[in-house]
Each structure stands twice: as structure tokens, then as C-alpha cells.
Design a protein with these regions (language model features):
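Core nucleotide-handling region used for phosphoryl-transfer chemistry
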Residues: 1-259
């Protein structure tokens, strides 16, 4: 098997909008997409017709996928002859409606929903073209929830994003959206490390790390209790389960006890 095409790289980090490097996003027009509560999933086909697949953290053997990815890998295999050589398709996998934290009404068609298609390293199809490609393949794609413009202040745009989160039902039904991802309409907006710049805002339910009491630690508080109170949250526990599922360590059976 040849090495994966150049576009098959790790997906850039999506910065929280409070991150200092994310401020540059509000100087350019942005699209707003729904953030789906699934497992990140990328796939491409090389010039020899070989399939390359990865989750957020690991490569996936197409012939021996972890259980949580099996249905999505089966979908990709069926589409093998229709994929553009050298393009990397990126999406979220949901093995079942309650894949991670949110319990949706349904899974996407084929258990994978696209959010980006790269035709070269750091060069992505526009949302409208990504939607056309998804339709050609018979896959779903995340919805476009709005546009933001630099003529508005960052505070105004963040308030608009929060309103979207608070009022928008997920494409998959059953829940309000987990959050939103914002991306530049045009290419060439990068972070200090040269990676494509993107940002996210998630609902309060998904704020992973915060002080359990909301107050500063007192002198004399046990440091282990302080750390435990900060990190022992439902969202962080669910994220740990997600990582175990991506690694094939969780099967949703009694065997999971002790995982």
C-alpha cells in the first residue's frame, strides 16, 4: 500500500472562540456549521485504489475496524469506486443515536455525516461544493446554520452564535445542537503555526473543565480534592468513554466493566 495522499493529514485543531489565536477569525467572513456529537472520521483513496481511514487519534484498518466504526467503514467501502482519488473526506461517525453524550433521534445515512472535504493539504471545498459532493455520494453533511461578517463586532457575532446554539434543533433530531463550528469563507486564514484557522462554541453542557464549586480554591484545601473537583465532570467522563470506543475498547456489553 502506498503512503496516504498529501491531503490525508490530521485535521487542524478547532479552537475555542475564547482562545487568543481565534480572534483573527472575526476579521473575515465566516460560515457557521452544526457541531455533531460523534467520533471524528477521515477517509481517502490513493492512486492504487487503496483505502486509508483514521479516527481523530488512530489509523483504522479497513478490514478490522473497531466496533464503533464498523458500519461507517462498511459505507466507505461501498463508496470506494466513487471517491475522488487524493481527496480526504472528513466527518463524524455515529454508531447509534446515543453515540456519545447526546441522544439524537437517528444516525446519519451510512453512519457518517460529512463536515469537510480536502482536495489538497489545508485546501477545502466550499460548503456548497461539499454539500454537492455529499449528495453525489449519498451521504449527509452538516447543515449551514448561518454566516458571520467582520462588519459586526466579535461580541455581537458570539452572541449570534449563542442564540443559534440555544434555539436550533440538530439535523439528527431529538436535541438542540451540541455547538457550532465557524470557518473562513475564503482560504488562507491560518493560525501562528500555519494551520487552517477554525473556531468552535459549544453549549454549556459540553464545557468540559471548570471548577465544581465555581469559587477559587482556599488555602488548606486538599490539592487532590481540588483537582478531582475540577476534572471529575460528566462531560469529561463521557469524553473518556468516547476515546475508549474509538480504540475499540468499548463494546456496549458487560465486557466493558473495568474498561
Amino acid at each position: 500500500m502506498k503512503a496516504a495522499p498529501p491531503s490525508f493529514t490530521s485535521y487542524p485543531s478547532v479552537l475555542n472562540l475564547g482562545h487568543k489565536d481565534a480572534a483573527a477569525l472575526f476579521t473575515v467572513p465566516l460560515i457557521v456549521q452544526e457541531k455533531i456529537d460523534g467520533s471524528q472520521f477521515s477517509f481517502c483513496v490513493d492512486e492504487d485504489g487503496d483505502l486509508h481511514i483514521r479516527s481523530h487519534h488512530n489509523s483504522i484498518n479497513p478490514d478490522q475496524p473497531p466496533g464503533g466504526f464498523a458500519a461507517a467503514v462498511g459505507t466507505v467501502k461501498r463508496l470506494l469506486g466513487q471517491l475522488h482519488v487524493g481527496w480526504t473526506y472528513r466527518g463524524e461517525v455515529l454508531a447509534k443515536p446515543h453515540h456519545n453524550v447526546l441522544a439524537y433521534d437517528r444516525v446519519p445515512a451510512g453512519n457518517v455525516i460529512l463536515f469537510d472535504v480536502a482536495y489538497d493539504p489545508d485546501l477545502y471545498l466550499r460548503h456548497v461544493d461539499m454539500a454537492t459532493e455529499a449528495e453525489r455520494l449519498g451521504l449527509e453533511r452538516v447543515p449551514l446554520l448561518g454566516l458571520l461578517y467582520p462588519t459586526e463586532s466579535a461580541a455581537t457575532n458570539v452572541a449570534r452564535l449563542q442564540e443559534i446554539i440555544d434555539t436550533t434543533l440538530s439535523k439528527l433530531g431529538g436535541q438542540k445542537v451540541e455547538g457550532v463550528v465557524v470557518k473562513p469563507v475564503a482560504e488562507g486564514v491560518v493560525d501562528p503555526y500555519g494551520n487552517l484557522l477554525m473556531g468552535k462554541l459549544v453549549s454549556e453542557k459540553f464545557r468540559e473543565v471548570h471548577a465544581a464549586s465555581g469559587r477559587p480554591a482556599r488555602v488548606g484545601d486538599d490539592i487532590i480534592q481540588q483537582i478531582g473537583g475540577q476534572y471529575h465532570t460528566t462531560a469529561r467522563w463521557m469524553k473518556a468513554r468516547q476515546h475508549l470506543r474509538e480504540q475499540g475498547e468499548i463494546t456496549d456489553t458487560p465486557k466493558d466493566i473495568g474498561a
